[in-house]
Regions:
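Ligand/cofactor-recognition surfaces for anionic moieties
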Residues: 9-595
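Single conserved hydrophobic/aromatic residue that forms the stacking wall/gate
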Residues: 1-8
Length: 595
């Protein structure tokens, strides 16, 4: 509506409307006020409500009905009744998931990419190439993608379509719309080189879309053998290079040729994680980012391309497949998370970027494939995406004030974002604003906006604040934050104060990093240093004595309450099991008597 009203004006363009910060500062307050008033006092007659606002009333009713629907559906399921199906997903993106309390389904993987997803994927692939060419003046040789189950389901295969179009193949469908084969797009029709690809998958995606990963390997074989090309075929040349690198690593020529078309990789041992988040945050245990990359190669090096080699780990294969990578791409389809609020983004795409840089000695470009706006899919530079989320959330006083209305969980969210920021600095420091830590220092350590930051965290969740200060100090120790002596002293003093007054919450940063503890102590004056050192010594001794994690003072009561609550829940659950068992016995006896 706003776009149509301002068409032809420099005040507003479609891409700018998609920028969250622009909407937040110019239109969101008024829209929120109008919607809030409507939802708090809904009229009995909706005819007086503007047509564009009527869906909000429907969604309100469906949300209010959802808890009862969920309870009724559970009882109906336990009674052997039918739980009716409905799509699952983000209600912001797809309101059809409301009301909840129905049997969620995702998609039929065999139909992917569906026709709409195919067109979306083609557009995003071309947008990727256009963006890369505008910066580098040439086509990329290889693009490496991250595939997640959520994005695959929500876009109905648009992520897969991007890869197919990069290769220059298109789907062949049967009468039921299933994608059963692929065919080459002629080189003249494609009008550009065939771009080589690599795909890393999450465990969930591997489990629900195994047939699509095998189809992708078929696409690699098909394009590697394409002849009479008008334009370069980077897939074919990449396959030959991969074979050559494997032979150089000691693989037999026959095996090297067989594995040269493998481009799909994921967690080893049929796992579900890169395993790199904990290692990254245990930063006292590694000195160089190359150690992180080596761990990534080991943990994500299982191939998932065909039945014969499903889950196999071939030494040197993943590294050889990463060669020549010019771009890494992360899908994004939800408004509920961003690159700094979800740790899996730095874990997967950040980890992939670092590993490519380690293998090729060149950092690839990094983009987000943004599916959030169904009418305007777009590619966004990772640095821009991080900056937008950073400025609109963790450095936004209004956002911070709203989050501070919450309790322990809200405070914990800040700590998680700080850890993710550290993770990005480890994996891809070029994506981070050089002034970010200084901005965080002014916002949280100095509280220059007078938000009551210290009072809030010390009251609600001192462990989160302790972790935040520890992350900043570890970032300085590692060289990611070029802090001044004053900044270091102030941050270390605050960290020591929390430890002195509240105890030490033994997270990876606070208790498990002896090098950081020495670094913190070196920033303190003699009296603070002595007290801090003694506090940490007592924590380690206590942990060694009882073998249990140390909890902050304010959290002990919560833990006891949790234990009591769990006991009550256990009694209730046990009673339900007994009652159910008795009921089954009675039912069986009745059936036996009737026979």
């Amino acid at each position: 509506e706003i776009h149509e009203r301002l068409v032809g004006s420099e005040m507003c363009i479609r891409d700018r409307l998609q920028d969250f910060t622009y909407i937040a500062h110019h239109y969101l307050p008024a829209a929120r006020k109008r919607l809030t008033a409507l939802l708090q006092n809904p009229p009995k007659d909706t005819a007086s409500v503007a047509p564009e606002l009527r869906p909000a009333l429907l969604y309100r009713e469906q949300l209010l009905a959802s808890p009862v629907n969920e309870q009724n559906a559970m009882v109906r399921a336990l009674s052997g009744g039918t739980v009716f199906p409905a799509p699952g997903g983000d209600p912001v993106l797809n309101p059809n998931v409301l009301p909840t309390g129905r049997n969620m389904y995702s998609i039929n993987a065999e139909n992917t990419p569906n026709p709409r997803a195919w067109e979306d994927g083609k557009r995003l692939a071309e947008a990727t190439l256009k963006q890369y060419i505008s910066k580098h003046g040439e086509y990329p040789r290889k693009v490496s993608y991250t595939f997640w189950a959520g994005e695959f389901i929500n876009t109905e295969g648009a992520t897969l379509a991007q890869v197919f179009w990069m290769l220059g193949v298109e789907p062949v469908r049967d009468a039921q719309g299933r994608v059963v084969d692929l065919k080459l797009v002629p080189s003249e029709e494609l009008g550009r080189p065939r771009i080589n690809v690599l795909v890393q998958v999450s465990g969930q995606l591997r489990d629900i879309a195994g047939s699509r990963l095998k189809l992708l390997t078929d696409a690699i074989r098909l394009t590697s053998e394409a002849g009479d090309e008008t334009y370069p075929n980077y897939v074919a040349s990449g396959t030959l290079l991969q074979e050559k690198l494997l032979v150089e690593k000691g693989t037999s020529p026959k095996r090297a040729r067989e594995m040269s078309v493998m481009r799909v990789f994921g967690p080893v041992n049929s796992g579900y994680s890169t395993g790199m988040m904990a290692y990254t945050e245990h930063s006292g245990s590694w000195e160089s980012e190359k150690e992180i990359a080596e761990g990534y190669l080991n943990n994500m090096g299982a191939s998932y391309g065909d039945d014969e080699n499903w889950g196999d780990v071939q030494e040197g294969l993943f590294a050889s497949a990463l060669s020549e990578t010019d771009v890494v791409i992360q899908p994004r389809q939800s408004n509920t998370w961003g690159p700094i609020s979800l740790d899996h983004v730095y874990e997967f795409t950040g980890g992939l970027s670092l590993t490519v840089k380690t293998v090729t000695s060149k950092e690839p470009d990094a983009y987000m494939a943004d599916y959030r706006n169904r009418t305007n899919r777009r590619m966004q530079d990772a640095k821009e995406a991080i900056a937008v989320e950073t400025r609109s959330t963790i450095l936004n006083p209004t956002f911070i004030q709203e989050r501070m209305k919450g309790g322990e969980g809200s405070a914990q969210m800040f700590g998680e974002i700080f850890r993710n920021i550290f993770g990005w600095h480890v994996m891809r420091p070029s994506a981070m604003d050089k002034e970010l830590f200084n901005d965080l220092y002014r916002m949280y350590i100095k509280d220059e906006n007078k938000l009551g930051i210290h009072e809030y965290f010390l009251r609600v969740n001192p462990a989160a604040f302790q972790a935040m200060t520890a992350v900043m100090l570890e970032s300085a120790r590692k060289g990611y934050w070029k802090a001044s002596d004053e900044q270091l002293k102030t941050t270390a003093s605050l960290h020591a104060q929390i430890t002195r007054e509240k105890g030490a919450a033994c997270t990876e940063f606070v208790c498990d990093n002896d090098k950081l503890q020495s670094f913190v102590a070196d920033q303190l004056d003699n009296s603070e240093k002595q007290t801090y050192t003694q506090n940490m010594k007592e924590v380690h001794e206590a942990s060694a004595t009882d073998g249990k994690d140390v909890v902050l003072k304010e959290h002990k009561l919560t833990s006891e309450q949790t234990v009591r609550k769990n006991r009550v829940n256990g009694v209730v659950a046990g009673s339900l099991v007994v009652i159910t068992f008795i009921g089954l016995v009675v039912l069986l006896k009745k059936r036996k008597k009737n026979k």
